[in-house]
């Protein structure tokens, strides 16, 4: 990260509760919650949107364009006092299949999860076929994952294929 040279800027960071050490901003550890790591840098805002976390009252930290040996650049999300439900993990897997989830309790990582693309996807993704029954009636969408890297889904009703690039979440 770029060192902050202005003492005025440094004072602002100190007043806002950040700790300055070795010319880097240190983000505090979370006591309880979820850390989503290894998000491709260009998928950060997709993950934020698909998980609907902008509407939460929980404290959150987002890091973008961080160095990563695996991804080149990555993003990270820390959410205090929030643990992802199965459907949220499935949504995450569709948007950022390389993501890793760390469950934090009492400041310790108590569980590490690798995100896996599910075999079946229900009620999460919209069918791209405008003639599909799911776009005209109150029918829950159902897809089979045909390919998981890059992700390709097949609609249960009309058999239309949808790739990851064109996926639209419900």
Regions inferred by a protein language model and the residue ranges of each:
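Single conserved hydrophobic/aromatic residue that forms the stacking wall/gate
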Residues: 1-16
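Cys/His-clustered metal-coordination modules, chiefly Zn-binding fingers
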Residues: 109-170
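Interaction interfaces in information-processing and related assembly proteins
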Residues: 17-113
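Residue-level signal for beta-strand positions within conserved beta-sheet cores that form or flank
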Residues: 5, 58, 151
């Amino acid at each position: 990260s770029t060192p902050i040279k202005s003492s005025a800027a440094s004072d602002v960071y100190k007043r806002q509760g950040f700790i300055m050490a070795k010319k880097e901003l240190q983000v505090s550890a979370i006591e309880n919650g979820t850390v989503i790591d290894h998000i491709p840098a260009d998928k950060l805002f997709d993950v934020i949107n698909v998980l609907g976390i902008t509407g939460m009252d929980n404290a959150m930290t987002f890091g973008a364009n961080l160095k990563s040996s695996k991804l080149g650049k990555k993003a990270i999300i820390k959410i205090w006092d929030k643990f992802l439900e199965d459907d949220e993990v499935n949504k995450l897997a569709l948007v950022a299949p390389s993501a890793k989830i760390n469950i934090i309790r009492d400041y310790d990582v108590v569980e590490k999860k690798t995100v896996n693309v599910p075999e079946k996807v229900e009620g999460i993704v919209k069918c791209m076929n405008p003639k599909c029954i799911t776009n005209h009636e109150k029918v829950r969408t159902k897809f089979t994952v045909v390919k998981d890297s890059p992700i390709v889904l097949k609609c249960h009703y009309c058999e239309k294929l949808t790739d990851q690039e064109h996926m639209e979440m419900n």
